[in-house]
Amino acid sequence: MDFYRLLLRPLLLSQLNVDPEWLTRNALGFLATLARSRSPLAANLRSYLRQTYGFQDPRLAMSLWGLTFATPVGLAAGFDKDGIAAPLWSDLGFGFAELGTVTALAQPGNPRPRLFRIPQDLAAFNRMGFNNASAEALADTLRGYFPEGQRSIPIGINLGKSKLTPLSGAVSDYVSSFRSLRSLGDYFVVNVSSPNTPGLRSLQAVTELEPILAALQAENTEQRPLLLKIAPDLVDEEVVAIAHLAQRQQLAGIIATNTTIDKSLLSVEHLPGRREPLATEAGGISGAPLRSRSTEVIRLLHRTTQGQLPIIGVGGIFSAEDAWQKIVAGASLVQVYTGWVYEGPLLVKTIQQGLLERLDSAGLPNLAAAVGSAAIDS
């Protein structure tokens, strides 16, 4: 029985004045408590989660950057910013989890309300503003959870710029966070694409971005995979320029994409509980409205790099078909967040089962053979 869809999803989609951030915080708090507990009850609950949501098949396994991803579906950054539930994500069937975004300085984020669900569009609208306890705090949390460095699934760490740090200090800010965490993550992501930190997206310009990437690579003595997360609102020429920069700086890959600021993708004129016109609201849109453009960006990146630069696809994944379209466009791995909130924790398992069906239908031996298979012809 899917208790999430029976009990929690109706609450999420109801017209009751329930703050989505409150729901998220409490759900995450429960998972964190479960992760910390050593009680027999907690052990039994975690075993139940693994039995209910776990699913693996060797045909879905991917090997990238010296890491093994038993399943290709990961948790996107933004849900577990401070890593407080880090050990739990494998129990829920994820093949990897991306923590953060974290910044060098602890910061509260933007004023509330700052997270909105828009059920009629299967979307979310957020202006969180990188609220987090700091890179050092995340480092302490990860040392506590994984004292021997052994993690059941690959853990990614998403790095952002502190709001109080001027753009001129962005290089040192990113480097500071990386120094705190570089031995504690399996891969790292440079986030210059959130719309919720003033001026951050300007760092996507090649002239601004190259010094940041070069400085991080100079610090990357342990040769951790370093990826870049980009916005869907870049024009194609900008995407191509960034792809070439990523190759020049020997990045491990690109995550496509972050949230969009294109409010024309929504059918509503106001955010829930707000009177201000949507056009005046600051923030980014995730969920189904992002699906098409994120897949277009993935396809463009794959073509531009001739499949030589791995891509993690994210944006509007609510089903196995959504994930499949991103994979055949060029994504080696995919991430979910908004779709996972709407569809519930069984989504990860459902996606994996559906991917196997599509491999069988296409006559392909494994998921690696599907990556980019439709990028050239479409």
Swiss-Prot record:
Binding site for substrate: K81, N126, R127, M128, G129, F130, N191, N196, N258, T259
Required cofactor names: FMN
Recorded superkingdom: Bacteria
Single GO molecular function: dihydroorotate dehydrogenase (quinone) activity
Gene3D superfamilies the UniProt entry points to: Aldolase class I
Protein topology in the membrane: Peripheral membrane protein
Alphabetized CDD domains for the sequence: DHOD_2_like
Enzyme kind, highest EC tier: oxidoreductase
Matching Pfam families: DHO_dh
Catalytic activity: (S)-dihydroorotate + a quinone = orotate + a quinol
Family annotation (HAMAP family): DHO_dh_type2 (MF_00225)
Function: Catalyzes the conversion of dihydroorotate to orotate with quinone as electron acceptor.
Family: Belongs to the dihydroorotate dehydrogenase family. Type 2 subfamily.
Protein name: Dihydroorotate dehydrogenase (quinone)
